[in-house]
């Protein structure tokens, strides 16, 4: 499923604090040995996520580009993705062998979606800490993303979340589309996500 005009583009969305940057870091580290990888991060007024990925040594700094979206980060991934497409074009020019670009959205809500012009595959990240009812609340990120990641499963006992309930709700809301429980802090579940990207993205 690699884009006709270059690398596979993977959109990573989800609410603030769900673990998007941690997932992006783990995927970069897991895949950069076998593939040419780059990242575009979206922040409203800063380049904080891009700088965090550089500090984490997810990739060499020249492979990480931060864009500032201004007031509404949803627009930059949906209605007018120009700023992101320009960043990807710049990375493509610098790294002609690029295989995968991860596009991390700014912290957003359950209604946020990626334009099909921007992302070939979409991953939506939610956190157990946001409440066990999150999967059944629905929204495009929950119901229509190609892969739903339910992160911070290790914290379920501390926040009163029942993973069995979340599993049942996610199964019902997603109509057999895949989802995975993860603990990004420990890297638990990363292999399954990499496998999904390889299979669905034709890598």
Curated annotation (Swiss-Prot):
Homodimer. UreD, UreF and UreG form a complex that acts as a GTP-hydrolysis-dependent molecular chaperone, activating the urease apoprotein by helping to assemble the nickel containing metallocenter of UreC. The UreE protein probably delivers the nickel. It comes from the Bacteria. GTP binds at residues 14-21. This is Urease accessory protein UreG. InterPro entries: CobW/HypB/UreG_nucleotide-bd, P-loop_NTPase, UreG. Facilitates the functional incorporation of the urease nickel metallocenter. This process requires GTP hydrolysis, probably effectuated by UreG. Keywords: Chaperone, Cytoplasm, GTP-binding, Nickel insertion, Nucleotide-binding. One of its GO terms (molecular function) is GTP binding. Belongs to the SIMIBI class G3E GTPase family. UreG subfamily. GO terms for cellular component: cytoplasm. It is found in: Cytoplasm. PANTHER family: UREASE ACCESSORY PROTEIN G (PTHR31715:SF0). One of its GO terms (biological process) is urea catabolic process. The keyword Cytoplasm applies.
């Amino acid at each position: 499923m690699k884009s006709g005009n270059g690398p596979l583009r993977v959109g990573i969305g989800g609410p603030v604090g769900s673990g998007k940057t941690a997932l992006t870091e783990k995927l970069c580290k897991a895949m950069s040995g076998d593939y040419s990888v780059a990242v575009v991060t979206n922040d409203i007024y800063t380049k904080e996520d891009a700088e965090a990925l550089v500090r984490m040594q997810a990739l060499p700094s020249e492979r990480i580009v931060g864009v500032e979206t201004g007031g509404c980060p949803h627009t930059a991934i949906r209605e007018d993705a120009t700023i992101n497409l320009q960043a990807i074009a710049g990375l493509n020019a610098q790294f002609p062998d690029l295989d995968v670009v991860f596009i991390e959205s700014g912290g957003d809500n359950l209604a946020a979606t990626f334009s099909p012009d921007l992302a070939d595959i979409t991953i939506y990240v939610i956190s157990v800490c946001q409440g066990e009812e999150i999967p059944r609340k629905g929204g495009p990120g929950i119901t229509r993303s190609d892969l739903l990641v339910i992160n911070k499963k290790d914290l379920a006992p501390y926040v009163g979340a029942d993973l069995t309930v979340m599993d049942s709700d996610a199964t019902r809301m997603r109509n057999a589309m895949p989802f995975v429980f993860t603990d990004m802090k420990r890297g638990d579940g990363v292999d399954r996500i990499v496998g999904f990207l390889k299979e669905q993205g034709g890598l």
